[in-house]
Amino acid sequence: MSLQEDIITQLGVKPKIDAQEEIRKSIDFLKAYMKKHGFLKSYVLGISGGQDSSLAGRLAQLAIEELRHETGDNGYKFIAIRLPYGVQADEDDAQRALNFIQPDVSLAINIKPAVDGEVAALAEAGVQVSDFNKGNIKARQRMISQYAVAGENGGAVIGTDHAAENITGFFTKFGDGGADILPLYRLNKRQGKQLLAELGADKALYEKIPTADLEENKPGIADEVALGVTYNDIDDYLEGKQVSPAAQKIIENWWNKTEHKRHLPISIFDDFWK
């Protein structure tokens, strides 16, 4: 088995999908997990205004609505959280996403005071935080906020990780990579677009250039620029298609370099890293 075939198998990516079938699969998955755990009453997700949180958010809201209808329990709810660092440049997109998702509850938490306070505390201790590292602090602070809200609402935190993100390790460890449940896992980037189109989302939500937008020295830097490879190449690779040798090398280098992100903390019994 080639490395490409092994990766595809591990991530469960199909070369072609039926959008309606995958929507139903994700909704049923979210419902089943909540019903299995009687202490859960809510799902929580941070909404950025990008493709992934728009899709995961809408799927979560639909799952919760079906749960309420099927069980007669109106205590189930979906909580969407805006988590800007100060004023978000693409706030209009975030509001467009919320309008599409129609969450039961919508909160806004400005993470800037917490992030800046942490950076200042580190500086007092003699640790100067780089812009890149500060970006990771932002991602982790967002997850702290989501888990705090979940903890007060009998909630589980939804993650937006999908195959195109997983293969490259393009997420912050214990930041946006920290979550309880991943309804998009198995889908690549273009397949996520298919689901959003099927759900009737505004094209602006899935045609905008993807960006993590964590670094202040590189505001709005496109994912594809940061990765050095296009999502089209990543998606083709995940669908078992041939890509250029250069693209294949970059993708497989990301996979190997970020393997630690796809594991729980390493114990003495783990050997994947050797």
Swiss-Prot record:
GO terms for cellular component: cytoplasm. InterPro entries: NAD/GMP_synthase, NAD_synthase, NH(3)-dep_NAD(+)_synth, Rossmann-like_a/b/a_fold. It catalyses: deamido-NAD(+) + NH4(+) + ATP = AMP + diphosphate + NAD(+) + H(+). It is an enzyme of class 6 (ligase). One of its GO terms (biological process) is NAD biosynthetic process. Pfam families: NAD_synthase. Its EC number is 6.3.1.5. CDD domains: NAD_synthase. ATP binds at residues 46-53, 160, 189, 211. Pathway: Cofactor biosynthesis; NAD(+) biosynthesis; NAD(+) from deamido-NAD(+) (ammonia route): step 1/1. Keywords: ATP-binding, Ligase, Magnesium, Metal-binding, NAD, Nucleotide-binding. Signal peptide: none annotated. Deamido-NAD(+) binds at residues 140, 173, 180, 260-261. One of its GO terms (molecular function) is metal ion binding. Mg(2+) binds at residues 52, 165. Catalyzes the ATP-dependent amidation of deamido-NAD to form NAD. Uses ammonia as a nitrogen source. Belongs to the NAD synthetase family. Homodimer. This is NH(3)-dependent NAD(+) synthetase. The gene is nadE.
